[in-house]
Amino acid sequence: MLEQQFAAEIQHIIDNKTKPLGALGQLEQVALQLALIQSQGKEQAATHIELKQPQMLLFAGDHGVADEGVSIAPSAVTQQMVLNFLAGGAAINCFCALHSIDLTVVDCGILLPVDSDARNLILRRLGSRTANFAIESAMTIEQVEQALRNGQQIAAEKIAQGADLLMFGEMGIANTSSAAALLSALSGHEVDHCVGRGTGINEEQLSHKIKVVAQGVGRCEGLSVNAILAEVGGFEIVTMAGAFIAAAEHKTPVLVDGFIVSVAAYIATLLKPEVRDYLLFAHRSEEQGHQIVLSLLEAKPLLDLGLRLGEGTGAALAYPLLKAAAQFYNNMASFESAGVTV
């Protein structure tokens, strides 16, 4: 858990800026959390918030459950989009470029491997895709454990290289099915409340998707977290959960994207509850399961734009709000320094 000895001092710094108490709303909460995180292990409160090297990690993986027709897109699209990310042509590339966010793609196991020596591609393949969880376990326990280790290693390396804020994105056809199954199995919420439209399926396809997800969830009752990850998890989702754990271990904040990334964050908090203190939430997505996981994490997202793209786009769009919180904390005058009396 975050050490709280500097919380009152940081709150005083915020309250003493030249504004009415609380007038900057949620930005004040963001500044408090960032300053508190950056005060961990220090002898005094952080009087300056550093956000100089944001890092987006985009985890890609394919899913055997795609064979059940739960998405309108074929698994080949995962590789095509990874190539698009590496070429700089996707929405996430546009938003990362706009805000000088470094983007790295992690191949956690996609059906069609990418033949590329791109500097921003990391290979941590656990296979070509998960097994079809509608009929068998998606992953082995060994794959789950390796995925968690992979995520921890990748995040730790980026932090060692200077990253002071992490953001995670994802790509994987049928990964909303895995995320919905994980959410239902881990939280006990009904499957039909966790399943959404993903790539834009119709009512008939949605009904089918709910039945498919329920088949996997039905095997999960009474299982441990790791066993549930093996039953219905995804390579990229579990790897991401490991990255969340490493971020907390290295006292680095993470700006959480949409539904799938939030499910990975939830998994990480079940494995390591202290992870929650390092999470800020970018947005509320259109996937209906996202509201459930936000409630479980007691999260108040910064934006509500009707997004349902994934890729980390919501996090990249919310990043300037974190910069704004740091800017007022670092540079806004106090009543005393400005000579303002109230």
From Swiss-Prot:
Q: Which pathway does it take part in?
A: Nucleoside biosynthesis; alpha-ribazole biosynthesis; alpha-ribazole from 5,6-dimethylbenzimidazole: step 1/2
What EC number(s) has UniProt assigned to this enzyme? 2.4.2.21
Q: Which UniProt keywords are given for this protein, alphabetically ordered?
A: Cobalamin biosynthesis, Glycosyltransferase, Transferase
Statement: the UniProt record of this protein carries the keyword Acetylation: no
Name a biological process GO annotation: cobalamin biosynthetic process
Q: Which residues form a coiled coil?
A: none
What family is reported? Belongs to the CobT family.
Function in brief:
Catalyzes the synthesis of alpha-ribazole-5'-phosphate from nicotinate mononucleotide (NAMN) and 5,6-dimethylbenzimidazole (DMB).
Q: What NCBIfam families does this protein's entry cite?
A: cobT_DBIPRT, PRK00105.1
Protein name in UniProt: Nicotinate-nucleotide--dimethylbenzimidazole phosphoribosyltransferase
Q: Which organism is it from?
A: Vibrio vulnificus (strain YJ016)
